[in-house]
């Protein structure tokens, strides 16, 4: 027992427990986020006697007489100051790390009211952010310090026109910690669910015994595969991910669930899981594409006739002949690793029984409607009996596209008729959700005497792990974009993705392009040296320009801005070369929208509510990219309204039309265009009537992004409705070899909110600095050996200067000219860094993370 003070209120805690559990589960102070419970991420920071401390570390019995402050306990002025400062700086994206950042910032400012930038960065060194790259968070801390010193909060600008630098609409709830992520939901009678997972990557489940677990007091139910009323398998495209592995069936990887346990409290849940007895027959497994493709290899998916998950072959022109006649030819092999998304919010879902016998899911994912489709099929019910509502989503980057906890929560609530929360531990999260594919690449490039690319021929092999996830589309995108953003005709690439008994691989920011771009751009840097021209010059000569044809045959439109990104970066490049600094350069392109002939709809309803305001309803997940703010800006601009006349209602399958997954850099473009079309209808209706006259009316907009399938027999197929382009540059410190500065110029079409665009660029650059230099997801016979704190994520005090350049080049006649930017920000970073290190020490590096750098000895 211990007595201490929380936010000015004395409390007595009878039961010894981690402080985070008391603050969250008993006091419901939801600003104290549970990102890892391992002392690694910093989302649970609180002040203990004025010192920032991770609440997942101390036990309550050790806190006698202490004074604890959470964000909820800050003064009204402090809350307002941090909210304004973080909004003005653009510091908030997914928001899950932000309350912890605020606490660390307050701890600093209380001791040092006028900190330097370096001091602010050091103060948050124990707080990880995966979205922002820390730059704008540090800006926000410095602005908050200024406001707190001066005692006055500036007036917030309310210009929400497209192109304005605006505060995101969800800043206050994320800064102050009252916005609800699924783990922040507490309802009366709520139970806790979890999975008993396989002990072996590949084994036959001989039998499962649940009686001992079921007999434990406080256990509600124990479910196995025989309890599933509908389809056993889920899957984003291929239905090859078992909800539960049944008796007699074979596990595919260590994350496979064999039973689900539901209990009245977390302690009982963990006890009961240990009482479920499972007997296995361990079987031979495969842990890489070479093993998986060998004759007679064990099948990962029974009945699949081998382990080939996907095959793609992209051909245009005659690459082999073009290379044969090239003046210069290079042939090299490249390798990129597994990497983990490391979003701050672990997967969580709260499932509530409905009166109609169905369930409602409060969840964190990248598409509420996809979750609805998969869970309703698993339950064997229609959509009315399986409703899904997105709460706030604490980051995704592709890692929350697949089912992780939603189907398990749905099954428990449906069978047991109790509200239940299912949340992955951080170690479960590291195991269960799909990662970035490791790839092995073989590239040959030919150029003429002027450095003009004549042809590229390549092969790609990827490991897609224990189930398909998005392995096929990722492989396809890796292949189609391997040609680079250049104007030449002869291109051939063949790709193979293999099932293995490793954890699954799927969508990850860049969607396969990050891997092949490393190969293409590294080879192009080597080619520049061979030809005798600069890396900048070889790109400028080959760069795709409006009206020209990409290697895939698509004619690009007037919005194409690769040349502008090169020109924007040139002064920085020339200055670095002049100063003798090691400098590297790389370009990239990335599609916006699904493309390649697949259905790709954006949908949006504008509903005039009883409050006389326009309510935006679009079935698209906001995972930190700021979609809600984008849609509000589009409505204000296109419907000619003021900010206070517009409300963003969020994403719920019960009220919003399906706008597809938040992936492929598609939502700003596709759902943004649907929103614009709805605005035009509303504007017409408002010509002779006021909003109050239109109460109850709905205005529906839909956009279908029509494209041609891969291999379409047309002269100039449209693979994607739009592409974004980028050039990034890395400058190293000549003395230390560490990164001194990153410059990133990105063509975004029309920047809806330039402040958000800068934040996306900075965050993507830092994420791929990790990809290039420090991050790894090591496996030992299919078992992850890293913890969150050992993944190699960059921290705030390690970040160099980052110059984000937003190239505003309208021209696309969709969504006010906007093109998605979420993925491309992380694509050209690694090859730019690799080239800088070549200039530093003369060593060519063709695998990631890069060897022999100050970051990795």
Kindly give the residue locations of the regions a language model identified:
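Flexible, low-hydrophobicity surface segments
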Residues: 145-308, 329, 415
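Intrinsic disorder at enzyme termini
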Residues: 124-182, 566-569, 576, 582, ...
């Amino acid at each position: 027992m211990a007595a201490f003070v929380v936010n000015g209120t004395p409390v007595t805690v009878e039961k010894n427990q981690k402080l985070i559990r008391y603050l969250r589960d008993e006091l419901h102070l939801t600003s104290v986020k549970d990102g890892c419970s391992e002392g690694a991420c910093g989302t649970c920071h609180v002040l203990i006697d004025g010192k920032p401390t991770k609440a997942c570390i101390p036990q309550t019995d050790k806190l006698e007489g202490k004074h604890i402050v959470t964000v909820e306990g800050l003064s009204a002025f402090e809350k307002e100051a941090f909210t304004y400062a973080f909004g003005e700086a653009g510091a908030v994206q997914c928001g899950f790390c932000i309350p912890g950042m605020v606490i660390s910032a307050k701890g600093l400012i209380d001791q040092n009211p006028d900190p330097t930038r370096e001091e602010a960065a050091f103060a948050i060194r124990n707080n990880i952010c995966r979205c922002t790259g820390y730059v704008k968070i540090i800006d926000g801390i410095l602005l908050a310090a200024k406001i707190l010193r001066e005692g006055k909060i500036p007036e917030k600008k309310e210009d929400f026109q497209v192109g304005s630098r605006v505060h995101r609409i969800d800043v206050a709830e994320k800064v102050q910690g009252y916005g609800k992520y699924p783990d922040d939901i507490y309802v009366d009678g709520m139970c806790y669910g979890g999975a008993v997972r396989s002990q072996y990557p590949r084994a036959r489940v001989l039998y499962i015994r649940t009686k001992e677990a079921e007999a434990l007091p406080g256990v509600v139910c124990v479910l196995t595969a025989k309890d599933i009323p509908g389809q056993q398998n889920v899957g984003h495209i291929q239905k090859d991910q078992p909800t539960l592995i049944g008796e007699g069936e074979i596990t595919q990887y260590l994350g496979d669930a064999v039973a689900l346990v539901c209990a009245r409290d977390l302690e009982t849940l963990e006890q009961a899981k240990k009482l479920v007895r499972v007997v296995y027959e361990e079987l031979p497994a495969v842990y890489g594409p070479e093993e998986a493709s060998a004759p007679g290899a064990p099948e990962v998916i029974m009945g699949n006739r081998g382990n080939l998950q996907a095959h793609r072959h992209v051909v245009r022109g005659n690459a082999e002949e073009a290379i044969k006649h090239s003046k210069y030819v290079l042939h090299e092999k490249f390798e990129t690793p597994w990497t983990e998304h490391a979003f701050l919010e672990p997967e969580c879902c709260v499932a509530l029984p409905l009166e109609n016998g169905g369930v409602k899911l409060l969840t964190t994912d990248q598409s509420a409607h996809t979750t609805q489709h998969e869970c309703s099929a698993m339950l064997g019910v229609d959509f009315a009996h399986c409703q899904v509502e997105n709460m706030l989503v604490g980051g995704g980057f592709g890692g929350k596209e697949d089912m992780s906890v939603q189907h398990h929560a749905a099954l428990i609530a449906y069978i047991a008729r109790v509200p239940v929360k299912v949340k992955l531990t951080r170690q479960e999260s590291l195991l269960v959700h799909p990662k970035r594919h490791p790839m092995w690449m073989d590239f040959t490039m030919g150029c003429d005497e002027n450095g003009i690319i004549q042809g590229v021929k390549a092969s790609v092999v990827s490991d897609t792990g224990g189930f398909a996830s998005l392995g096929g589309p990722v492989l396809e995108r890796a292949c189609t974009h391997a040609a680079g953003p250049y104007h030449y005709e002869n291109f051939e690439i063949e790709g193979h993705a293999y099932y293995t008994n490793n954890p699954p691989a799927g969508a990850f920011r860049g969607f396969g392009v990050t891997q092949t771009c490393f190969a293409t751009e590294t080879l192009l840097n080597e080619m520049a040296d061979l030809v005798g021209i600069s890396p900048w010059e070889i790109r400028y000569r080959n760069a795709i320009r409006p009206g020209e044809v990409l290697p895939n045959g698509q004619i690009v439109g007037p919005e194409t801005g690769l040349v502008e990104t090169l020109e924007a970066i040139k002064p920085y490049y020339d200055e670095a070369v002049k100063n003798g600094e090691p400098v590297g350069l790389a370009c990239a392109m990335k599609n916006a929208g699904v493309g390649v002939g697949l259905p790709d709809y954006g949908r949006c309803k504008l509903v005039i509510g009883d409050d006389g305001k326009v309510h935006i309803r679009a079935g698209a997940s906001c995972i930190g990219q700021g979609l809600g703010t984008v849609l509000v800006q589009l409505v204000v601009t296109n419907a000619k309204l003021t900010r206070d006349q517009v409300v963003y209602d969020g994403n719920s399958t019960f009220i919003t039309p399906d706008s597809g997954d938040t992936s492929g850099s598609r939502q700003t473009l596709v759902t943004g265009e649907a929103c614009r079309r709805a605005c035009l209808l509303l504007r017409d209706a408002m010509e002779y009537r006021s909003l109050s006259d239109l109460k109850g009316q709905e205005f529906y907009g839909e956009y279908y992004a029509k494209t041609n399938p891969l291999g379409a027999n047309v002269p100039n197929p449209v693979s994607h409705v739009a592409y974004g382009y980028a050039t990034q540059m890395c400058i190293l410190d000549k003395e230390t070899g560490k990164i001194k500065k990153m410059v990133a110029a990105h063509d975004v079409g029309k920047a809806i909110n330039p402040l958000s665009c800068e934040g996306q660029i900075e965050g993507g650059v830092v994420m791929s600095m990790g990809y290039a230099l420090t991050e790894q997801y090591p496996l030992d016979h299919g078992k992850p050996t890293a913890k969150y704190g050992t993944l190699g994520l960059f921290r705030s005090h390690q970040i160099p200067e980052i110059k984000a350049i937003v190239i505003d080049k309208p021209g696309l006649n969709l969504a006010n000219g906007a093109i998605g930017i979420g993925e491309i920000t992380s694509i050209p970073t690694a090859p730019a860094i690799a080239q800088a290190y070549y200039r530093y020490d003369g060593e060519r590096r063709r695998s990631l993370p890069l060897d022999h750098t100050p970051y990795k000895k």
